[in-house]
Amino acid sequence: MIVNGIGALNLKPGLGDTATDLIQGGVAPATSGNLGTSFAEAVSQAASKTVNTLQNAEQVSLQALKGDADTRQVVDAVMSAQQALQTAVAIRDKVVSAYLEVSRMGI
């Protein structure tokens, strides 16, 4: 599965742009007392949100097996988890690509 760009991940309209939600939603706005979050914190928060989305999909799937959730809830949760995972993979691929590009640079 190759993802050409984060913007291409609009799998389900109405759920919001997961890539934007993961990145922008986890970063606090800079204020005079707060210089903003570091890149590591932003990535950590995005990863945590991705894990939470995947765990939610798993919980909804288990609820459906018990008869406590309908099919629509399962589909929404699984599609959201798929979109979050694809976004995480795309970000990982870009980070690895950037690292390899920097490592090939001449000094």
UniProtKB/Swiss-Prot annotation:
GO terms for biological process: bacterial-type flagellum-dependent cell motility. It is found in: Bacterial flagellum basal body. Its main location: other. The keyword Aminoacyl-tRNA synthetase does not apply. Keywords: Bacterial flagellum. GO terms for molecular function: cytoskeletal motor activity; structural molecule activity. The keyword rRNA-binding does not apply. It comes from the Bacteria. GO terms for cellular component: bacterial-type flagellum basal body. Pfam families: FliE. Belongs to the FliE family. HAMAP family: FliE. This is Flagellar hook-basal body complex protein FliE. It comes from Mesorhizobium japonicum (strain LMG 29417 / CECT 9101 / MAFF 303099) (Mesorhizobium loti (strain MAFF 303099)). The gene is fliE.
